[in-house]
Structure formats: structure tokens, C-alpha cells
A protein has these predicted regions:
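Non-catalytic terminal extensions of PLP-dependent enzymes
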Residues: 1-113
Length: 113
């Protein structure tokens, strides 16, 4: 995947990608489109929806409280084959563009004291 033009996505699979993997990728894109249509059609909350709030960590998925209007199943296992191949991210979304524009140093002091 690459982002050659602002707000675009280019998908260029290599010859080493098996067709089954490309098919799963396409299924995921179709599912995301369906979820976007739910937002467009008013079936999903415009702010708190599975598209905007993805990805969900294991901690969030297993927490006692689920603060979202959509179900955990939809959030964590949107497609049947995901259940058998699920891996959980350590963090939710990171706004890389925001981080690039608003640098925040978290390292210790660099002075020689």
C-alpha cells in the first residue's frame, strides 16, 4: 500500500501474493464500503461507528464496558474468516499526519548535567 497523492490509496500487490490473500483483501474493502454506506444512510452513528473507531484493541474488546452503539462482534470480527485469523493491535488509530505536523518530544533531557 502507498499514498502517492494526498487522500488517496494505491494498492499494488506483488506477484508473490496468492490469489486467496487478494480475495480476502477485496472482501475487507467491500465490508468497509458497506459500513460506510450504513453511516451515509443513517443506520450507524456519524461519530461513533465501526469505521471511525476501528481498530479495537484486545483490551477494549474484552473490557466489561463497551461504550459503542455497535456490537463487539461487528467491531472485532467483521467477516467470518477474521475469527480464525484475528490479531489484535496494541493501540487504536494513530493520526500520523497530525503527529508529523505537531511534533511532541517525549525523550528525557539531552543536556549534559
Amino acid at each position: 500500500l502507498s499514498f502517492p497523492v494526498h487522500e488517496t490509496l494505491m494498492v499494488e500487490p506483488t506477484e508473490s501474493e496468492p490469489k486467496a490473500e487478494l480475495d480476502r483483501f477485496m472482501q475487507a474493502l467491500v465490508q468497509i464500503k458497506r459500513e460506510c454506506e450504513e453511516i451515509r444512510d443513517g443506520q450507524a452513528d456519524a461519530e461513533d461507528n465501526v469505521v471511525k473507531m476501528a481498530q479495537h484493541t484486545a483490551g477494549e474488546a474484552c473490557a466489561d464496558v463497551w461504550p459503542h452503539p455497535y456490537g463487539r462482534e461487528k467491531a472485532v470480527f467483521p467477516l467470518r474468516w477474521v475469527r480464525e485469523n484475528k490479531f489484535f493491535p496494541y493501540v487504536t488509530k494513530i493520526d500520523g499526519g497530525y503527529g508529523d505536523r505537531n511534533l511532541c518530544c517525549t525523550c528525557g533531557s539531552l543536556s549534559k548535567e
